[in-house]
Regions:
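Non-globular, low-confidence helical/coil segments that flank catalytic cores
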Residues: 1-215
Length: 215
């Protein structure tokens, strides 16, 4: 059945490939999908693009909130909890990939780590924060770039499945062979959109189904 409403939409940072189409979705809610809450990084990490989308959301009746490391959101109808693991406030880092929202989603025995575009420094900050834990599913950081998925990071997260979002024959060479090798050595099943197309995960809190669609 068609999705008519989204409780929460999270924007990790302001890169175009992470926000494209968001303003249009917010402006066309009467005819499209209703978005109840838009969640943004802390204000110190908002660039003008994110701030502009926030203003568009507010004008169209969507509640706009920010989330920072250590804060959580819980869906009252289920046991789904989403915790912000980064970025920390007060780093002086400014907007960009390194300041991407990093979110840990847990629902019963299911857990997924969503990493935005953080790379080496961002992953190390997560390791040092003490907030990082084990997540069965990892959304690989920065499209599986060379500087993501360090061995230390993977030893803590211990993912069984890694989902990589990357276009076919993209000019950046994502995902990088070294990153794929580290994920394989960590025992991951790799689901890359290059090979699988659209990837959908379904969980009832105990089991996990992975579906893909490729034209």
């Amino acid at each position: 059945s068609a999705v008519e409403e989204l409780d929460y939409v999270f924007l990790t940072h302001g890169d175009e490939d992470h926000i494209n189409g968001m303003a249009e979705l917010l402006e066309d809610q009467e005819l499209g999908v209703r978005i109840r809450n838009l969640v943004l990084p802390p204000e110190e990490y908002l660039d003008e693009k994110l701030a502009g989308i926030g203003r568009t959301a507010a004008r169209n009746g969507t509640r706009v909130v920010t989330i920072e490391a250590g804060q959580s959101l819980r869906n009252g109808d289920t046991d789904l909890e989403i915790t912000c693991l980064g970025p920390e406030c007060g780093t002086g880092m400014g907007p960009g990939n390194g300041a991407s929202l990093v979110l840990g989603a847990r629902y019963g025995a299911f857990g997924m780590l969503l990493t935005g575009d953080v790379e080496l420094e961002g992953e190390q900050n997560l390791v040092n924060s003490g907030r990082l834990g084990r997540y069965p599913v990892l959304k690989a950081a920065h499209h599986g770039s060379r500087n993501s998925g360090t061995e230390e990071f993977l030893q803590i997260v211990k993912p069984a499945v890694a989902v990589i979002s990357a276009g076919i024959e993209n000019r950046y060479g994502h995902p990088h062979e070294e990153t794929l090798e580290r994920l394989k050595n960590a025992g991951c099943v790799i689901c890359s959109t290059q090979e699988c197309g659209a990837v959908m995960l379904r969980s009832d809190g105990s089991s996990l189904q992975i579906e893909s669609f490729l034209e």
